[in-house]
């Protein structure tokens, strides 16, 4: 670990002690918002403190074993203990480095998943459906819940567009690097000549806005339309205009919801999505500017960026943001087995962040 990273760890340890002192202050205890904020920060620093304490114990074990090495009768045992302590210190060094990576406060939260067919006609809609099913099955494996908020089915299967809310701890942390353009190469079911077609779909991963996050939305900037729902709810929804479409005129963002029986419930859901979209747009601008400055690929949040190609003839998936990231496991991945792919992206992002931290004072 570099001296710069070690200094940052020491600063975090000092901050933990400071937080423990602050949280015993009656003025802080009496202020619910401040107490909650500081308590959350302290809980995030606990893993760092625990790892540092374990590192100190491993260093003490190493020193004891090295002292015993001079004793001929204890040398063999000492060598074993030295090797074990050194291996543990290497593990802790990597663990502490990963704990230094700034934690995104949205990582534990829910998200909105949007999949839209791009170029390629019917095949693009079918591919969009395949992508949505891939994410839905991955979510099921994680124990998350997927709630479709709106959809527009394709004429021959799949979706022209589908929007869903994914609910589960850590959902955003695992799927946040999926935003972008996904391209597929395969022979469509409707292709009689056996020719390979290329089509595309776009994916957007938008973190659900926290209740404490503030964004001012002027009611005068909203255009609200009602229409008859074609979604869940049976015959009732087709007899009343319960579905809601909200347009934020200044930004052009449009959201709709038709899954609930009541217009009021659909409006509440639509407003949550609108708030999330507007907050995400602000963050995306900042992330894109930072990524351009730092020349990052993973985590840039650019939805126009082609991030991945699914080549069915070769059974291959290539992620274009990470050099050499090609997996020959397409059948399992498209069925929701995303752990290996997501793990590589998270590792790359962590490496980028550690490089940035090492370069900063």
UniProtKB/Swiss-Prot annotation:
Pfam families documented for this protein: PCRF, RF-1
Protein localization: Cytoplasm
Gene Ontology molecular function: any one: translation release factor activity, codon specific
Main location: cytoplasm
Posttranslational modification: Methylated by PrmC. Methylation increases the termination efficiency of RF1.
UniProt GO cellular component terms: cytoplasm
Keyword Cytoplasm attached: yes
PANTHER family: LD18447P (PTHR43804:SF7)
Biological function: Peptide chain release factor 1 directs the termination of translation in response to the peptide chain termination codons UAG and UAA.
Family: Belongs to the prokaryotic/mitochondrial release factor family.
HAMAP family according to UniProt: Rel_fac_1 (MF_00093)
UniProt name for this protein: Peptide chain release factor 1
Native species: Xanthomonas euvesicatoria pv. vesicatoria (strain 85-10)
């Amino acid at each position: 670990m570099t001296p710069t990273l070690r200094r940052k760890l020491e600063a975090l340890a000092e901050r933990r002690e400071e937080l423990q002192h602050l949280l015993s202050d009656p003025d802080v205890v009496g202020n619910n918002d401040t107490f909650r904020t500081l308590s959350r920060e302290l809980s995030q620093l606990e893993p760092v403190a625990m790892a540092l304490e374990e590192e100190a114990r491993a260093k003490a074990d190493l020193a004891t074993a090295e002292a015993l090495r001079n004793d001929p009768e204890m040398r063999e045992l000492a060598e074993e203990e030295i090797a074990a302590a050194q291996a543990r210190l290497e593990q802790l060094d990597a663990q502490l480095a990963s704990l230094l990576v700034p934690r995104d406060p949205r990582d534990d939260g829910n998200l909105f998943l949007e999949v839209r067919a791009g170029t390629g006609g019917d095949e693009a809609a079918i591919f969009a459906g395949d992508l949505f099913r891939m994410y839905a099955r991955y979510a099921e494996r994680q124990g998350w819940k997927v709630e479709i908020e709106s959809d527009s089915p394709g004429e021959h299967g799949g979706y022209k567009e589908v929007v869903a809310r994914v609910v589960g701890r850590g959902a955003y942390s695992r799927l946040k690097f999926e935003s972008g353009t996904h391209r597929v190469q395969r022979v469509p079911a409707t292709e009689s000549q056996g020719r390979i077609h290329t089509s595309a779909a776009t994916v957007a991963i938008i973190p659900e806005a926290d209740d404490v996050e503030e964004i001012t939305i002027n009611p005068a900037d909203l255009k609200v339309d009602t229409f008859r729902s074609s979604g869940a709810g049976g015959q009732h929804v087709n007899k009343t205009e319960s579905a809601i479409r909200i347009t934020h005129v200044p930004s052009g963002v449009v959201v709709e919801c038709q899954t609930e029986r009541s217009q009021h419930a659909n409006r509440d859901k639509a407003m949550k999505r609108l708030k999330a979209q507007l907050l995400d747009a602000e963050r995306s601008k900042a992330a894109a500017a930072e990524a351009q400055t730092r020349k990052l690929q993973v985590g840039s949040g650019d939805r126009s960026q082609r991030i991945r190609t699914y080549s069915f003839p070769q059974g291959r998936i290539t992620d274009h943001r990470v050099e050499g990231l090609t997996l020959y496991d397409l059948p399992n991945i498209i069925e929701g087995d995303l752990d290996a792919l997501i793990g590589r992206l998270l590792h790359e992002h962590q490496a980028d962040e550690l490089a940035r931290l090492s370069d900063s004072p």
